[in-house]
Amino acid sequence: MGGTISMRRSRSTGDLRQRLLRARGETYERLLGEVEDGSSQSLGELDKGLSSLSCEGQKYNQEQYMNTPWRNPAEEREKLAYRKQNMDDIDEEDDDLVGDTVRPKVPLRTMSYKLAIDMSHFIKEKGGLEGIYYSARRHRILDIYLEKEEGIIPDWQDYTSGPGIRYPKTFGWLWKLVPVNVSDEAQEDEEHYLMHPAQTSQWDDPWGEVPAWKFDPTLAYTYEAYVRYPEEFGSKSGLSEEEVRRRLTARGLLNMADKKETR
């Protein structure tokens, strides 16, 4: 039985890479997490357990967090029930992204630290994401794939906002987004496009960068997103509201959010 499951996973993961490579591009959307959501939260909602944490030089492990330091088990159960109730409402277009129905083959569950690590290594072993350019559509394909094959509720995939390396906000997910240099010739070359279709360009990215997935095993030991950019976690960071806004403003993220709201 184990061999059968392994063979099925191997085939399906190989299909994932091909579907990601074939995915048509879309304008870069803010699937990286809306910074205004974090910055607008009241400090009164701050978890007391986080108030004593320092965000400098700390390492995190699965004993400290379920996955991220603000997961609420009751809320997660509600999400799980909601997903089960609304599974039939998923768009047909989403079905096409993975080439099959997105009805999960296993019971639905939330992403955990251990599960994120297991899925990261499994996808790496099958060559799933390495070097593939990030796009909103590919983000969605990965969500649907793990929902269908592993029953993982697609609320886990989120990255820091950039510029530069975008670190996963889900502790245990070992794939970060790294800006790569793509020459004009490579972007215009038909063969390169077919082999590595850069479905997101520097014109789609708010920072003018072309991010690609890269495996980083050290993310299993250090919660880089939280250590480097605590302000992106809003009131959950332990920072004062003023400090959160100051840091977001210094990085140009609040201005970016304001421009989006006025469009």
Curated annotation (Swiss-Prot):
The keyword Transmembrane does not apply. A lipid is attached at G2 (N-myristoyl glycine). InterPro entries: HIV-1_Nef_core_sf (IPR027481), HIV_Nef (IPR001558). Transmembrane segments: none annotated. One of its GO terms (cellular component) is membrane. Keywords: Host cell membrane, Host membrane, Host-virus interaction, Lipoprotein, Membrane, Myristate, Viral immunoevasion, Virulence. One of its GO terms (molecular function) is GTP binding. Residues 88-96 are annotated as: Acidic. This is a macaque isolate. The N-terminal domain is composed of the N-myristoyl glycine and of a cluster of positively charged amino acids. It is required for inner plasma membrane targeting of Nef. Homodimer. Interacts with host CD247/TCRZ; this interaction induces down-regulation of cell surface TCR/CD3 complexes. This is Protein Nef. It comes from Simian immunodeficiency virus (isolate 1A11) (SIV-mac). The gene is nef.
